[in-house]
Amino acid sequence: MCTLMHKHDDSLFSNSFGFLRLPLEFYPYTRHNDWVITGVPFDIATSGRSGSRFGPASIRKASINLAWENCRWPWNFDIRQKLKIIDCGDLIYKSGNVQDFTNILQKHIENLLRFRKKILLLGGDHYITLPVLRAYSKFFGTISIIHFDAHADYYDNNNQYDHGAVILYALHEKLINPNRSVQIGIRTEYDKNFGFTVLDAEYVNTTAVHVLINQIVSVIQNRPVYLTFDIDCLDPSVAPGTGTPVIGGLTTSCALQIIRGFQKLNIIGIDIVEVAPVYDCAQITALAAATLGLEMLYTQVKF
């Protein structure tokens, strides 16, 4: 199989086709493009149910359902005519070697940023965000994040590699500024003393979308912001295919409406994580992830 940089791949979960039927381009760094999609099939840092290593392939497969539209509703243009987007396939790493994976992912992101690419990552568990933020810090310094999740992800389990501690590690390394960052959809234990603006799930589900968007924009302003979307932010009724589901989450409609309010934000990168298709039903979780990813790209078209 052809793979990123034509490295040998003996995994059983890598993709064979691109997101939204985009052609696979295995030398993404010097290509003339705006956005690069990379699959990150990694779930060794999962504390609950594993299986998100199959997330990238499932999201790409579900994205076929979206490829037929010239103009994704409610937008009035074809994103493929406005943004130069390529899919470079899946990251290749030594199976079972977390440090090898961490180094390879960080280097891949650094190479893309060196050539001024913007990045959409398809995970994989939420640990993948940490090496990505390390790479971004070398180019942007301390940045803001918008973090969609059911969990705050700063739980200290004394484990160097833990998807539930990615935000904690990012804070310790000063990769992100919590006072200029927003967490959305949280509905498990969190500590207000960390400094994040937290729009918990109950608040989001009972507040007008325009109010939520105004709050988010007022915190982020024009700062460089990284958008990380854990699919368990959504309610399990619409996204059952994930490792640590929590009831009382966002609907897909609510998430889409919030994301559409990000058009004026300075988004420098995106990831969508924790899709575990083995627990999915009729591909609805993968379809939600694919649709949200496409919607995020639409918001990045500047007129």
From Swiss-Prot:
Regions annotated as coiled coil: none
InterPro entries to which the protein is assigned, alphabetical: Agmatinase (IPR023694), Agmatinase-rel (IPR005925), Ureohydrolase (IPR006035), Ureohydrolase_dom_sf (IPR023696), Ureohydrolase_Mn_BS (IPR020855)
Residues where Mn(2+) binds: H126, D149, H151, D153, D230, D232
EC number(s) from the headed UniProt entry: 3.5.3.11
Cofactor(s) recorded in Swiss-Prot or TrEMBL: Mn(2+)
Enzyme class: hydrolase
Disulfide bond sites: none
Name of the protein in its database record: Agmatinase
Annotated source species: Blochmanniella floridana
